[in-house]
Amino acid sequence: MKFVIVGGGISGWLSALIFSHRKPNHEYVIIESSDVNTIGVGEGTTGLFVQTIEQLPDINVAEFIRETKATPKIGIEFNNWSGKGSTFFNPIDGTLTTNEDFDSFLYFTYIQNSSLDTSSLHGLLKRKNKSPYTEKLKDYNSALHLDNKLTIQYLKSKSLKRKNIKYISDTVSKIERDETGKVEKIICSNNIIEGDIFIDCTGYSRIFSEKSDWVSFKNNLPMNSVTTFTRKHNVSMVTKADKLNLGWC
């Protein structure tokens, strides 16, 4: 069976690594266009991302964090959303504070009027400004902040070492389907690629669904624009979302 993944990026290269590991006896082709620029913004994950790449034999979590300059993300702090001066911290993943000998009834009676971070390891880390790992990474289940470009480069380098992954640098110009609408082949500038299963990792381009019915939620999205910029500051393990009169930052 031949899998065709259209689009590089984190989703494309990670799909190639996961599928080719889970189903190593199949053929995998990934098409990436040099005409499409990488969006140079930060990315955030959940702890499930780390658990996922841990299962890949050619990826070491410590190496991944070092090469991509990733930093821990233990939660999101919402400021002023319930009134000026209010704060709510939402931990992302992290183990609950558990003890088999602890009387859970008394414990939950205590925290019933407390915030979520009372029962979360990440809530404690946030209050103490501590990192969720030491020199040796073990049972690392924290979310991460990622550098998008560095992460793509890392995943791509690992993918290209797999013998069952073929890389094609080309630009898709047309999608050919059968009478039922199933994709049969992809016409590129310099290649025609056929396959059995096609995976769309083209992001906003949505090349496989561009002609599908579209349901707009524009009227339900009062905040429909964003301005991005970078600034120098100490690395934080918490994403802050401060409510403003118009929108948030």
Protein language model features and the residues they cover:
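Predominantly flavin-linked oxidoreductase catalytic cores and closely associated redox partners
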Residues: Y140-C249
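A structural signal for isolated positions on well-ordered beta-strands in alpha/beta enzyme cores
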Residues: V4, E27-V29, K166
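N-terminal Rossmann-fold NAD(P) dinucleotide-binding loop
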Residues: G12-W13
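Dinucleotide-binding Rossmann-like beta1-alpha1 core, especially the glycine-rich loop
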Residues: N37, V41-R127
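A short, surface-exposed helix-loop junction/capping segment
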Residues: Y28-S33, Y133-Y140
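Glycine-rich FAD pyrophosphate-binding loop
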Residues: S20-V41
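Beta1/beta-strand and adjacent pyrophosphate-binding region of the FAD-binding site
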Residues: M1-G9
